[in-house]
Structures are given as C-alpha cells and as structure tokens.
Amino acid sequence: MALLAEHLLKPLPADRQIETGPFLEAVAHLPPFFDCLGSPVFTPIKADISGNITKIKAVYDTDPAKFKTLQNILEVEKGMYGAEWPKVGATLALLWLKRGLRFIQVFLQSICDGERDENHPNLIRVNANKAYEMALKKYHGWLVQKIFKAALYAAPYKSDFLKALSKGQNVTEEECLEKIRLFLVNYTATIDAIYDMYTKMNAELDYTV
C-alpha cells in the first residue's frame, strides 16, 4: 500500500476549492498504480494521466498565483478561449485526468467493498470492469473498448495486485485494504469535487476517442 499511503491528498476545505499545486504533486505519484495491474494494455491510461498532469502543470507554472485552484484554471481559460472552451488547454487535460483518477477510485473502492466473482474470488476482473464501465467506457469508441475488454482478462490475481501495491512489504490483505480505505477518504472527496465543478461550469464533454 506504500504506493498510495505515501501521497495522501489534502482534506477539502469548506468551499471545496482544490489547490492546484498540492493536487498535482499528489496525483503525480499515481501513474505507477497501473504497473500493479500487470497488463501492458493499461499503459495508455497511465500515459494519459501522466500527460494530462504535465499539461496542467505547464499552465499552472506560468502563474501559480492566478491558477492557485483548479477552479481558477477553468475560470481563466473560459475567459481566455471563448467559444473554443472547454475543449482546450488545461481544462481539457483536467477533464480527461479526472476520468483516469475516477477509474482508480472506483476500482479500489470495489475491492474494499469485497465485490468479486464468487467462482474466481482471487481475480480482480470484476473490480476492473466496474471501474472501466463507470469511468471510461462511454468515452471510448468500439475499438478502444475491445482493447480494454481484452485487458480485463489479463488482470492479475488480487493477492498479486495488493502485493505490488504494497511494494513487496510484508503486510496482510486486511492491513493493505485498511490503508486503501484511508487513502480513498480525501481522494474520493477530491474527485467528486472536480466532477461537480465541471457540471456546475457546464464544462463536461461527451465525445469519444
């Protein structure tokens, strides 16, 4: 669980504003999560998350004060790009980043909730499929969906996944799950706040890739 426990997200303030710098610093450590899934077919999601973090950081670094929060980024870019917004800039990068982060959240929550294939309880295919269905599938065309369906069958055993997530540390499954639950508290609240922000600002897009 070391991979997640070392980089917990900050609790949200009352106004649910997410500070850009600390957010990017925390999520920058998440792409290796996909290495724990074993299959190289998950590499595109990993690369997508890394690439979108880089794009948002490039905008943030131009003026950290102006782009102090994620909402600041959307508001400034809305005024800057006009009719092209929200399909441009860091707004578009964050749109896709939140989907990749939601995949991780739904997947981990499903494992913590004990959802599984009763005939194959040590497989994480059920969890990965739920995460894909909820976070990414509707934004993928037929070909990409087919590729990911194949990837789900290559997902590792739960025991191997948790061991990889723990970076080889000798911890029990329950200890690992407890650390995942701790990680998910602020992580889930943050992802929910980003989704709500996109809805309120009418910045959500439904096109497929």
Swiss-Prot record:
Alphabetized UniProt keyword annotations: Acetylation, Cytoplasm, Lipid transport, Repeat, Transport
Residue segments, region 2 X 12 AA approximate tandem repeats: 45-66
Main location: cytoplasm
Domain of life: Eukaryota
CC terms in the record's Gene Ontology section: cytosol
Residues modified to N-acetylalanine: A2
Sequence repeats: 45-55, 56-66
Pfam families for the chain: GLTP
Chain positions recorded as beta-D-galactosyl-(1->4)-beta-D-glucosyl-(1<->1)-N-[(9Z)-octadecenoyl]-sphing-4-enine binding sites: D48, I49, S50, G51, N52, I53, T54, K55, H140, Y207
Gene3D superfamilies: Glycolipid transfer protein
GO molecular function: glycolipid binding; identical protein binding; lipid binding; lipid transfer activity
Subcellular location per the Swiss-Prot or TrEMBL entry: Cytoplasm
GO annotation, biological process: intermembrane lipid transfer; response to immobilization stress
Protein function: Accelerates the intermembrane transfer of various glycolipids. Catalyzes the transfer of various glycosphingolipids between membranes but does not catalyze the transfer of phospholipids. May be involved in the intracellular translocation of glucosylceramides.
Stated family: Belongs to the GLTP family.
Subunit structure: Monomer.
Identification of the protein by name: Glycolipid transfer protein
Organism per entry: Mus musculus (Mouse)
